């Protein structure tokens, strides 16, 4: 089947040479029957692992009842999921989309709509961080502070500024009377698992309050328990005005969401819409995921396992000089290696039955299912140890 790729599929992905056909828990199997421990999890998507019984049952039951209906009509699953998100976050109103990029596009539109209503169109610029990633549709692409993703797609959307992450002075300097919002990831995922400092996040909130700007938090990768808290902002003692979600919310089923404080949720009928966003099947999946993730002890378990994993990586760091730095929160972990390119490590790990990926060339990213066990973490660490021992640096 892989031989048909170039004939039928656009050449948009650097794929690894395996065909995945089955998944269960933290493992997947290829077409040759080989099993892999999955520490990619669909890039932080399979929050409950593969084919979790509660998720499968929710999707199956809903598929037998009502798969899709237009947003011209109410559906109870959409209302229920919105309620769960609102009551477990900061009490905002929710708009459903189908992906993180869509959610971020909507957040950008919402910020500009809010500023237009309040300031008559004088404020429209949005500040984002260098090295950030917010998606590949035009607004989200322009918000992304990485030139490599911009090449060949100009002219981009006007009205974006980029400042270095954690540089509070640069942030103050970037604010002028045309800025309407600051958009941030508390941990840059595609950018290399770089964390915003508590001081920086609090400074963003302070600057937004002082200048009547909207604080947009991209929680597409950090949200739904990935960092050991239900939402990443909970680590910092601040609350955003707008938050975007996707990835882990559906546990593998496509869904995205914008959450906005009630006074910032200024969209009116016709301002924004989605054909598929908030369909009953996607929302049933989201409800099943949130039911599991919000169970007593679940998030504490994610935090505990994340610390256990980082401690294991720090032990490897002492043994292997190529390991430069360990960073991240919960089960969103980065391991920077002293190489120009970490792809050989990724490929060797795959050969030994461990799926990982690299970002920013030399950072190994680990985002396993949140249900991973300490025994499976030990297994992954052993494979990494073997790989690092075999490769000549």
From Swiss-Prot:
Pfam families with a match to the protein in the record: Aminotran_3
Q: What class of enzyme is it?
A: transferase
Cofactor note as given: Binds 1 pyridoxal phosphate per subunit.
Residues engaged in binding pyridoxal 5'-phosphate: 100-101, 133, 218-221, 275
**Protein's pathway:** Amino-acid biosynthesis; L-arginine biosynthesis; N(2)-acetyl-L-ornithine from L-glutamate: step 4/4
Swiss-Prot/TrEMBL keywords: Amino-acid biosynthesis, Aminotransferase, Arginine biosynthesis, Cytoplasm, Pyridoxal phosphate, Transferase
Q: Which cofactor does it need?
A: pyridoxal 5'-phosphate
PTM-bearing positions, type N6-(pyridoxal phosphate)lysine: 247
Protein name according to UniProt:
Acetylornithine aminotransferase
Which species is the source of this protein? Answer: Caldanaerobacter subterraneus subsp. tengcongensis (strain DSM 15242 / JCM 11007 / NBRC 100824 / MB4) (Thermoanaerobacter tengcongensis)
């Amino acid at each position: 089947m892989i031989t048909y790729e170039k004939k039928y599929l656009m050449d948009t992905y650097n794929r690894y040479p395996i065909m995945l056909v089955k998944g269960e828990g933290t493992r997947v199997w290829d077409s040759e029957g080989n099993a892999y421990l999955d520490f990619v999890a669909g890039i932080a998507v399979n929050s409950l692992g593969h084919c979790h019984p509660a998720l499968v049952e929710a999707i199956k039951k809903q598929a037998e009842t009502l798969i899709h209906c237009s947003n011209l009509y109410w559906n109870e699953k959409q209302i229920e999921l919105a309620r769960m998100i609102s009551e477990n976050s900061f009490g905002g109103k929710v708009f459903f989309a189908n992906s993180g990029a869509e959610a971020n596009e909507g957040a950008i539109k919402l910020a500009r709509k809010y500023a237009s209503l309040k300031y008559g169109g004088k404020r429209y610029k949005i500040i984002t961080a260098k090295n950030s990633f917010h998606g590949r549709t035009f607004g989200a692409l322009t918000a992304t502070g990485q030139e490599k993703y911009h090449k060949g797609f100009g002219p981009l959307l006007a009205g974006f500024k980029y400042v270095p992450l954690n540089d509070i002075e640069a942030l103050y300097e970037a604010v002028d009377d045309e800025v309407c919002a600051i958009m941030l990831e508390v941990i840059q995922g595609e950018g290399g698992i770089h964390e915003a400092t508590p001081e920086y996040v609090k400074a963003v909130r302070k600057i937004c309050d002082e200048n009547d700007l909207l604080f947009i938090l991209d929680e597409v990768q950090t949200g739904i328990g990935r960092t050991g808290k239900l939402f990443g902002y909970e680590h910092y003692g601040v609350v955003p005005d707008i938050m975007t979600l996707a990835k882990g919310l559906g546990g593998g089923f496509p869904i995205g969401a914008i959450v906005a404080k009630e006074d910032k949720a200024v969209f009116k009928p016709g301002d924004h819409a989605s054909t598929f966003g908030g369909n009953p099947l996607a929302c049933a999946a989201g409800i099943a995921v949130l039911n599991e993730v919000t169970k007593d002890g679940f998030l504490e378990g994610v935090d505990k396992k994340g610390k256990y994993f980082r401690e294991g990586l720090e032990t490897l760091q002492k043994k292997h000089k190529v390991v430069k730095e360990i960073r991240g929160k919960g089960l969103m972990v980065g391991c920077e290696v002293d190489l120009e390119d970490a792809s050989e490590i990724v490929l060797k790990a795959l050969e030994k039955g461990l799926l990982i990926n690299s970002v920013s060339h030399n950072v190994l990213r680990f985002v396993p299912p949140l249900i991973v066990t300490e025994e499976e973490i030990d297994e992954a660490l052993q494979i990494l140890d073997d790989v690092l021992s075999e490769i000549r640096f």
